[in-house]
């Protein structure tokens, strides 16, 4: 359970430029370590359409970038980023260049990136639930820039595992439904290193599956019980209320710093919003209908 902390390469000519090309993982890690890069006056191009790409773009604005462009090969409507993230990026001055597929990186005589060539796209057949892009009959476009940030996803470090005989397929470790690694008896894997980057809840679920099967592999059959009594949850005195939306700081102010962009709830709003809880832990919901289990 090692997560996915390595960057993914886009695989185009010029990506190996000595300066002017970096990854979202590298950039955001530096910010997290309080080693803020200086983008003052720079033109930044971000490649990608997910939440991480929006984080990179909005962070670039806060680091002083003069212009930030987000390049995505599909439509803006097809972006995997949350709509509020895309709206927030645009409100803070980022340009979204949709239907533009990166082709190669332009470099100068010093091997520094000075621009990104993109090929205009058009929407084609629907595959996997969303329209696929295809090359449009238009000329390539050069986007001049000082820095290109690749934000197309994360991967895992597999080399050391492969060297020790662990089966790796398409960048992830192959594991059985029991979480045991194929042909490696007694070794288990789960989370992002098996599924690829996913949600926290999927990683937690994988951990629970692995724990149960490791327990059985070791010859035990432990059972976990809960003696916590959950108080009755009644709705007799509850008045139905609408959702309280969180207020945002003005884009012109929030883009100047890394402080929270939301104001948060007032005491009154917090009390009202918490009163809307459906108490799924008590009653259960959907496939979990029936409430909390006493033993598992």
Predicted regions and their residues:
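Mid-to-C-terminal Rossmann-like scaffold of FAD/NAD(P)H-dependent oxidoreductases
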Residues: 88, 101-108, 112-113, 124, ...
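N-terminal glycine-rich dinucleotide-binding loop that anchors FAD/FMN and/or NAD(P) in oxidoreductases
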Residues: 15-24, 30, 81-108, 115-121, ...
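Glycine/serine-rich phosphate-binding loop and adjoining beta1-alpha1 elements at the start
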Residues: 1-30, 275, 279-287, 293-296
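Rossmann-like dinucleotide-binding cores of NAD(P)H-dependent redox enzymes
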Residues: 57-104, 222-235
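Short hydrophobic core segments
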Residues: 1-3, 45-47, 144-153, 270
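Rossmann-like NAD(P)H-binding beta-loop-alpha module
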Residues: 35-66
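FAD-site-proximal beta/loop scaffold in flavoenzymes
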Residues: 17-41, 126-197, 238
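A conserved FAD-binding loop/helix module that cradles the flavin
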Residues: 56, 190-224
């Amino acid at each position: 359970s090692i997560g996915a902390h390595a960057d993914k390469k886009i695989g185009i000519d010029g990506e190996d430029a000595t300066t002017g090309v970096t990854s979202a993982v590298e950039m955001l890690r530096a910010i997290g370590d309080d080693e803020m890069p200086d983008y003052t006056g720079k033109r930044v191009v971000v490649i990608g359409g997910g939440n991480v790409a929006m984080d990179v773009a909005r962070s670039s604005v806060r680091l002083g970038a003069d212009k930030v462009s987000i390049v995505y090969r599909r439509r803006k409507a097809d972006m995997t980023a949350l709509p509020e993230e895309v709206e927030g990026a645009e409100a803070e001055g980022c340009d979204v260049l949709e239907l533009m597929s990166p082709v190669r990186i332009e470099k100068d005589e010093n091997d520094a990136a000075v621009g990104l060539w993109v090929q205009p796209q058009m929407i084609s057949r629907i595959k996997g639930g969303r329209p696929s892009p295809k090359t449009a009959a238009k000329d390539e476009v050069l986007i001049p820039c000082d820095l290109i940030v690749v934000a197309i996803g994360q991967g895992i470090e597999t080399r050391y595992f492969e060297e020790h005989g662990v089966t790796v397929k398409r960048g992830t470790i192959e594991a059985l439904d029991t979480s045991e690694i194929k042909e490696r008896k007694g070794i288990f894997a789960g989370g992002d290193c098996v599924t690829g980057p996913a949600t926290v809840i999927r990683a937690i679920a994988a951990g629970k599956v692995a724990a149960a099967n490791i327990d059985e592999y070791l010859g035990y059959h432990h059972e976990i019980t809960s003696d916590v009594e959950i108080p009755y949850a009644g709705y007799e005195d509850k008045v139905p209320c609408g959702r309280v939306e969180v207020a945002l700081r003005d884009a012109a102010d929030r883009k100047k710093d890394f402080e929270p962009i939301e104001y948060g709830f007032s005491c009154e709003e917090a009390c009202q919003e918490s009163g809307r809880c459906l108490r799924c832990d008590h009653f259960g919901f959907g496939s979990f209908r029936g409430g909390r289990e006493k033993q598992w």
